[in-house]
């Protein structure tokens, strides 16, 4: 019997990073093996049943633009879709979807099993095979060895995973799945800097025991958004609502009383948790002035009664979990189906990675996902795709690729990781990107699909649809530039009827569209204007492109100014809490590090471009006040004289 053991690329781990890595490598023609501990958990959502959100939705769109699976899978599995920040500018609008966990796993597995060049095997990897600091393959728990020219590790929270519930702890990669202990030991023997991080999940609740009568309903958006550029609403399953409730003072008293047995506060948990997804006990302690916190009740699927109570992640004892859940309005008789828990795991300093996500120490070994100190399905999937791409390019002896910070949130993510490192689980926000006005969800394909096609990540069907869209936008922009509206017609535009602007000259449609408040639809409705044949989504992107043109250029100039301020000296012992607008995280980190210059401040993990802008404003105000005071002193001196 012949069983192939020789591959171009081996991917270890079948989560969000691993599935994207394996698909990317196989799409590029590499003979690929995906090894996973359990075939039934491919694409598993280990924590919250959702995809997208602020910054994260942008990453999903970029994955889709590069031919990845996540966006298309959530379009087939999403049971509620919303556009966050819909009242704000296009740059910070973000798509978010609740997922049916089972449908999502099925959508991912369907794509894996249909992908040419890709084999999947259920087996646990215990060892990495090396020859002179070069990866040559892996060995499994059954003693089977597989050779490869590149290996991508996407092991999530499984390396040395230790789960905590109250005073109890046990080895696990997540509840119900064993930790990777031998592989963790093997990696610790290598020339890699290792640390511990922590994440957590809330207890699950049986919806049949929830009283929804007095809870606030949160339906999805109409019209329903889609994630994939090739998606349509006909792919969506039945849509459902989420619900909202709040903790209360009784809840907080129960939590405070249970802290004596909280592994977070007894020192049993050493790993640092995600700042922007704190446990409920962390919220109660850190924000003691708050008398309540929001809890979102999110369905886990269409064929299950389980509910995910987003906002009460906890590692308190099971008894305390029951008490705290039942103290919340609507949950007085709630039955917990699975207890919440925290989990600690190994990660490796991402500053030891190249921008390709290949380790500097071991040739051919790539890391992607939580092993690099990130948190979130979307961050993991984006890294996985990039690692799979670069592993393939390495085998082809081609130059590695990573988008720059002005090309993609993926570029921001990787640059932050490999230059700044992490001190806590890293998640993506739009505020991390200095070029966020041009890194929008709507134009992710315009930024990345051509590159994806050149690498072989994007198939011909997607390429033809994209090329037609791009041509339609450019053709319509040209038409807007050459089409002029004569004087005396502007009064027909509803937006300008109350405007003081003169109507005594002609304007091109392009000029008019750049004005705030004038929509593309309104412009082309003028009887003097030839009608357009482009569809709604293309029209929306065209309008955003035109209106944002000037803002994008100004943002570029601002980034250049920031670079010029690299050597600007910061005052010694500056109390950063006096700088208006800084977040608690930024204030805390700046006070702790006390950087000497703006450049040093900008390179601290977690310090965003927006924070640097606020710092510069603060310094300029201080200099202006000092100059005014000196002038005042000078004038008073002249008066005395």
UniProtKB/Swiss-Prot annotation:
Binding site for FAD: 13-18, 125, 180, 370
Assembly mode: Homodimer. Heterotetramer of two MnmE and two MnmG subunits.
Pfam families (UniProt xref): GIDA (PF01134), GIDA_C_1st (PF21680), SAM_GIDA_C (PF13932)
Gene responsible for this protein: mnmG
Protein name: tRNA uridine 5-carboxymethylaminomethyl modification enzyme MnmG
Reported function: NAD-binding protein involved in the addition of a carboxymethylaminomethyl (cmnm) group at the wobble position (U34) of certain tRNAs, forming tRNA-cmnm(5)s(2)U34.
UniProt xrefs under SUPFAM superfamilies: FAD/NAD(P)-binding domain (SSF51905)
PROSITE patterns referenced in this protein's UniProt entry, alphabetically: GIDA_1, GIDA_2
GO-annotated biological processes: tRNA methylation; tRNA wobble uridine modification
Binding residue positions for NAD(+): 273-287
Keywords linked to the UniProt accession: Cytoplasm, FAD, Flavoprotein, NAD, tRNA processing
MF annotations from Gene Ontology: flavin adenine dinucleotide binding
HAMAP family with a match to the protein in the record: MnmG_GidA
């Amino acid at each position: 019997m012949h069983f192939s053991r020789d591959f171009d690329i081996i991917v270890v781990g079948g989560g969000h990073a691993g599935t994207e890595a394996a698909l990317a490598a196989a799409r590029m023609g590499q003979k690929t093996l995906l090894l996973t501990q359990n075939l039934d958990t491919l694409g598993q959502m280990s924590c919250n049943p959702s995809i997208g959100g602020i910054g994260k939705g942008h990453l999903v769109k970029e994955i889709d633009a590069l031919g990845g699976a996540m966006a298309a899978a959530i379009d087939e599995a999403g049971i509620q879709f919303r556009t966050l920040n819909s009242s704000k500018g296009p740059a910070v609008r973000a798509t978010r979807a609740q997922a049916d966990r089972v449908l999502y796993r099925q959508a991912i597995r369907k794509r894996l099993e249909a992908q040419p060049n890709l084999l999947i095997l259920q087996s646990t990897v215990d060892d990495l095979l090396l020859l002179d600091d070069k990866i040559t393959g892996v060995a499994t728990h059954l003693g089977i060895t597989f050779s490869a020219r590149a290996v991508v590790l996407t092991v999530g929270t499984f390396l040395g995973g230790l789960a905590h519930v109250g005073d109890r702890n046990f080895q696990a990669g997540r509840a119900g799945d064993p930790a990777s202990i031998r592989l963790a030991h093997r990696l610790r023997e290598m020339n890699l800097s290792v640390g511990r991080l922590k994440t957590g999940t809330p207890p699950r609740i049986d919806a049949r025991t929830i009283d929804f009568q007095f809870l606030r309903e949160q339906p999805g958006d109409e019209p329903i958004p889609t994630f994939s550029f090739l998606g349509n609403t006909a792919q969506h399953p039945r849509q459902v609502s989420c619900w909202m409730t709040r903790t209360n003072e009784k809840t907080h008293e129960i939590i405070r009383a249970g802290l004596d047995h909280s592994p977070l506060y007894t020192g049993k948990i050493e790993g640092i948790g995600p700042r922007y997804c704190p446990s409920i006990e962390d919220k109660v302690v850190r924000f003691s002035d708050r008398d309540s916190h929001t809890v979102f009740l999110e369905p886990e699927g269409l064929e299950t009664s389980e509910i995910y109570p987003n906002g009460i992640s906890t590692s308190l004892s099971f008894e305390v979990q029951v008490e705290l859940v039942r103290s919340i309005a609507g949950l007085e008789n709630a039955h917990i189906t699975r207890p919440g828990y925290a989990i600690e795991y190994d990660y490796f300093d991402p500053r030891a990675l190249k921008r390709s996500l290949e380790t500097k120490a071991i040739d051919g070994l790539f890391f992607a996902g939580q092993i690099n100190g990130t948190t979130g399905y979307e961050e993991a999937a984006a890294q996985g795709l990039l690692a799979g791409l670069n592993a393939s390019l390495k085998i082809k002896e081609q130059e590695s690729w990573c988008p720059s910070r002005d090309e993609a949130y993926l570029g921001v993510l990787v640059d932050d990781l490999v230059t700044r490192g992490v001190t806590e689980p890293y998640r993506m926000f739009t505020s991390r990107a200095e070029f966020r006005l041009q890194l929008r969800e709507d134009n992710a394909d315009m930024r990345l699909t051509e590159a994806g096609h050149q690498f072989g990540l994007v198939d011909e069907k997607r390429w033809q649809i994209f090329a037609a869209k791009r041509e339609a936008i450019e053709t319509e922009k040209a038409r807007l530039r050459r089409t002029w509206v004569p004087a005396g017609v502007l009064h027909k535009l509803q937006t300008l009827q109350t405007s003081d602007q003169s109507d005594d000259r002609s304007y091109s449609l392009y000029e008019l569209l750049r004005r705030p408040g004038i929509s593309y639809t309104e412009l082309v409705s003028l009887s003097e204007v030839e009608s357009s044949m482009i569809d709604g989504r293309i029209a929306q992107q065209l309008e955003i492109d035109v209106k944002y043109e000037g803002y994008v250029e100004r943002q570029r100039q601002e980034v250049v100014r920031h670079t010029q301020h690299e050597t600007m000296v910061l005052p010694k012992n500056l109390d950063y809490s006096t700088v208006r607008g800084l977040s608690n995280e930024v204030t805390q980190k700046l006070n702790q590090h006390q950087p000497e210059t703006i450049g040093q401040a900008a390179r601290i993990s977690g310090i965003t471009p927006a924070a640097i802008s606020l710092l510069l404003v603060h310094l300029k105000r201080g200099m202006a006040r000092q100059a005014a005071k000196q002038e005042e002193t000078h004038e008073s001196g002249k008066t005395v004289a």
